[in-house]
């Protein structure tokens, strides 16, 4: 039909075909890799799918891939389309890699990018224990948390020793060892400190002491 003809004309001069259909749908359209490569041997195909290999035809979406990796909390939806956005970055990387391979070898290839793999990659900090409740960036470190302030909230990211030392100084914390940042008493003292300060005051303190904090409503 006219659409197939128009597409073939475009593919004849294109470097890359980027698709996000399931493999079975691509084959029904006559756009499976074998058919594509035979007709357009210089064409690279970046095939964005839900899951890799034999699982690629199973239906799914950003939410299901995030849920599979334990990245959906309670009944709340994630604040962004993390698997989709991560998959877009992976597709960009795959495209550039395939173009370099073709430039050096003359060979075009199909490269699969799975959104579930992107979700898995994004979930690695949790799998490693970094963002679990007992992890340093999961809330266990008192200098890396969100606290209430007088008129909103404050995100505190004083993780590195020099930032932690600066925070301890302004908040008058008695920190003798790194482990002191992981005790409830330190968290409670910081909570009291932030609660009595406004967002404007905290912004001034942050600027004056080179502290990585950001206030929010």
Residue ranges with predicted function:
Residues 27-145, 150:
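Active-site-adjacent "lid/gating" segments in soluble enzymes
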Residues 21, 68, 158:
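Glycine-rich, N-terminal phosphate-binding loop of Rossmann-like dinucleotide-binding domains
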Residues 22, 100-104, 172:
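Hydrophobic/aromatic-lined pockets within catalytic cores
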Residues 142-216:
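Aromatic-enriched alpha-helical interface/lid elements that frame and gate functional surfaces
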Residues 19-21, 80, 190, 194:
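A short, small-residue-rich loop immediately preceding and capping a beta-strand
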Residues 19, 45-47, 215:
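Hydrophobic residues in well-ordered beta-strands that form the structural core
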Residues 1-37:
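A structured beta-alpha segment of the ubiquitous adenosine-cofactor-binding alpha/beta core
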